[in-house]
Amino acid sequence: MPIRTPFEARPLHGFNLRYLFLVIYVWFLRCLAYLEVYLTNHLRPLPGPDVTVSKVWFPSRDKGRKIFANIYRPVGLKEGSMPVHINVHGSGFAIPAFFGNSRYFCYVLAKLLQCVVIDTDYRKAPENPFPRGSIDVSDCILWVHSQPQRYDLSRVTLSGFSAGANLAMSALQQITPGMIKAIIAFYPPSDATSSYACLGVRRFPHKMFRSGVQLASNVFTLFNSAFVQRHVDPSVSTLSVLYTPIENIPDYGLFVSGAADMYMDTVEIYNRIQSLGTPAQKAGHRFLGIPNEAHAFD
């Protein structure tokens, strides 16, 4: 059964001029994102024939609603006790077009590790603000754990990119500790309490980047406003995942960032684990910084 959490009852944005502005601005960016994904789709490698990709709708905790996901499965992998990796795409919490951008990452994991990879979707802001996205991610984890006849529940891992990494770490706090054995977080926004959180300027002081995207501060402000309602306490750990309770963090983890906007947010999570974690957590976590790379360099 889903673990109900107090923040789950928080209401949506109120319908007012501010919300109307958010919707219009976000939809404008969504249109640009769909165009960008269409024009650059040929640059992203397709999965090879040695991994099958299927589509699935799995049940959410909300009656009558389902969540979409792509499942990557190596050809020849036998049914029963299959290890599982769950991936959560980046989106700025608001852009649906980026679902599927991690397809080659998912393919490589499935191929090399001989595991099932579930690339899950989630609800987007501002129509579905905090905490609905992370609830969908936790529902995916719970759905996997409801199938012990199919999956090896002792080998379930999790990853996320950007906003998806934030949602992944938030979801860790909504499930029973130990359900996830390892986490990979790529440049997660982690501290909404910082005065710079909505501007995206907490970065390592690099100016030149080889690849990736340098997001403008006003775009960060928009995504933050769309995702976080005004009444939400920014210090709640399911939003500011830097403060995730240590007991909810797996013993193994990898935190990855380029030298752009999310560098400090990422390295501070790692530093906190090294400071407060158990001996197993301290030994099992790593930080990987990629010099001269911007946001979404991968």
Regions found by a protein language model. Give the residues of each.
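An N-terminal hydrophobic leader/cap segment in hydrolases
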Residues: 12-59
